[in-house]
Amino acid sequence: MKKISRGFSLIELLIVVAIILIIAAIAIPNLLRSRIAANQASAVGSLRTLNTAEVTYAVTYNTGFSPTLGDLGPPPGTNAPVATAAGLVDEVLSGWAQSQSAATVSAKSGYKFTYSPAATDMTGRVNAYQIYATPISPGTTGTNYYFTDQSGVIRQNSTAIAGSSDSPLAG
């Protein structure tokens, strides 16, 4: 009588595992590059949103630009927007989600956003601001550094923290 063999041999299983590892070695770096590109696109979009929110804040409250990122955030509960909680950006971008207070730093999509009121007059009116977007983990969450100010121009640098002298972002 002949013995019937069922299942896979060890060699067949090793070949399947090797093929899966080769496919993973090709796919994972592409996936990471895609994630970096998505984070960088999100950072640029967030800077555009913050620039628009700052102009809206200045026009709406007639007090210049906001003193903090938190002032651009949503009002607590169902309260109406006020100068300290204008409701122009979400709680993540305003920093409220991280600190539960008026923040000058927030984090979103692998980037840290640092807000700095740059020029204040005698009445306390903020006439200029700077926002820096830096990767939380350079090379992993993003490779470019971004900067914007009250001019609305977004600038980038791929080697160091961006500033007003760096080249503007194309598009």
Regions found by a protein language model. Give the residues of each.
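Extracellular/periplasmic head regions of type IV pilus-like filament subunits
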Residues: 52-142, 148-151, 158, 168-171
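Regular, well-ordered alpha-helical segments
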Residues: 25, 33-36, 40, 52, ...
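N-terminal single-pass transmembrane signal-anchor helix
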Residues: 2-31
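Gly/Ser/Thr-rich helix-start
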Residues: 8, 143, 153
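Aliphatic-rich helix starts adjacent to a transmembrane/signal segment
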Residues: 4, 30-47
